[in-house]
Amino acid sequence: TVANPWVANRQTADQGRVVVTAKGEEQIIDVETKCTSFAYEADRVAAAVAAGEVEGAWPAMAWDDTMGNLTTLDSWRRAIGLTYDLELEEECKPLRGTLAKRDDAPMKYGKVEGLDKPVSKLIMGCDNQQIYAHGAAMWDDWYERGGNAFDTSWVYGGGKMEILLGKWVKARDIREQVVVTVKGAHSPRCLPDLLVQDFHESLERLQFDYADIYIMHRDNLEVPVGEFVDVLNELKDKDLVRGAFGGSNWTIERFEAVNEYASAHGKQGFSVLNNNLSLARMVEPVWGGCIHASDRVSRQWLEETGTTSIAWSSQARGYFLPEGERMKLGADNFACWDAPDNRARRDRAEELAEKKGCTPINIAAAYVINQPFPSFAIIGPRAIQETATSLPALDVELTAEEVAWLWGEE
């Protein structure tokens, strides 16, 4: 037993005690020490650093154990509504004092039609940050690594995600340096007048004067495409949308119909398709009304038309993680992806990852951003560690032959 297991004692050497109970008899073994528990921890860290290791050897606590403890503590705090003073919005400052892109930032960039700003090839999905302190830490780190693009929607968290992201952008004073996709018109509000209403509410939540990119989150087949094109162009004419329009979970046929109408009437059409595209074929819709563009026909159309793809669930929600990590997410998480052809793709990703010195999930993300058309991948890290392990995909260069082989198109 240890007198105080929670805080390493820096003042006195706590004596250890082992209590052994056998056949109803108790034996007490006192373990004398002249060192404080803090000294033991410091020595263990020093030994690990000297050996070039990233964590101390047993019995030191492993990183996974530490993170598990912190995750549990966070869940307890959420349950009782505890927020520390340092986590208050006005106290959540950048770790280095001022927010800036690091000199060694690994991010790469692409171009989206209608935007003067470069757009990071990986885009931060903003649909899971529940408190400002968490969001600010994630987004500060993202920006420092070179990430300048964010994806959010009117429907996420009942508006909470837009509010938190907007507060962070305002606090950091970086509105002109970031690209934020505003999405709306999600079912059942996929009607022209409600699109406009929700768009204005999104800008109000975000505290923005304009949207960089506007994407319709769903389509409504009962509404002629021209009605959507008309209201979107009214927003553009008021300088409320300064870049591209697009559709999420839209069929190619309806997407083309939008552009035919826009061309015939001298208006701006769609240039961004925001469907799922990943190395794993979407076997079942992740959510109702979801559409993928992973199939060969859709990818050929994207290439032939030069349409920009901004892919959601670009890493198939962890399908390419090692089995141990994959199972932590729960088997139900992969019902939308698991199939013999996708297992074969995962096997090929694992094989290629070994050759290229990266992870299979890096191969999965690289597959998306190495397509022969403008292609961006939305990722949804829940922790800074997940961001860090996703970014090596940027350095993975795939040939056209490797892209085809990964999908199974030899």
Segments from the language model and where they lie:
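NAD(P)-dinucleotide binding in Rossmann-like oxidoreductases
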Residues: 1-47, 55-64
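A short, structured active-site edge motif that brings together acidic residues
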Residues: 176-187, 272-277
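Active-site mouth loops of central-metabolism enzymes
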Residues: 122-134, 183-194, 217-222
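N-terminal binding-site loop/beta-alpha segment at the start of enzyme catalytic domains
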Residues: 91-178, 209, 237
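Beta/alpha (TIM)-barrel catalytic core signal, keyed to glycine-rich beta->alpha loops juxtaposed to Asp/Glu
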Residues: 219-410
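C-terminal helix-rich "cap/oligomerization" subdomain common to oxidoreductases
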Residues: 47-106
